[in-house]
């Protein structure tokens, strides 16, 4: 097996990030990335398998970690009894959301790719995955606190999905528009 040249991997990632940010996944060219990185497309295929693998290498660490943290927050909250959940919901949510925002802004280039340039990748529906997690745990919360709208059928699955999606879209819209954390 041929020895890989030191620094090429990092350089390819740097050039790929720029290419994907400028053109999006669908229009990005491995040839252009290889040229900018001073390597060959074969070198990229050896390291990343394909364009999707290269995109994944850029976004998965941050995307996976945010999802892991989000699930951990949900799980830890749902360890509380129903009364504690009801009493602590606002405070707990605000604190957790602040931590997630901090993480997103610490990994802003990755989330810009994920939110603005992922069409055509396995990450194109990343927000939908977060929405499904939130909807699932919202139902658990409603059961734990005996939320009457859920019990009486006034809150449909479709309405909850719409409201949750709009909340997530509004949160991530600030990233799409390049707004600073301050």
Identify the role of each PLM range.
Residues 1-5:
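N-terminal intrinsically disordered/low-complexity leader segments
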Residues 11, 15, 19-53, 57:
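Helix-turn-helix
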Residues 17, 114-131, 182:
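C-terminal/domain-terminus segments
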Residues 56-65:
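Alpha-helical DNA-contacting segments of helix-turn-helix folds
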Residues 57, 71-103:
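Hydrophobic alpha-helical connector segments
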Residues 95, 99-106, 121-147, 158-165:
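Amphipathic alpha-helical packing segments from all-alpha helical-bundle domains
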Residues 113, 141-182:
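Hydrophobic/aromatic-rich alpha-helical bundle segments in the mid-to-C-terminal region
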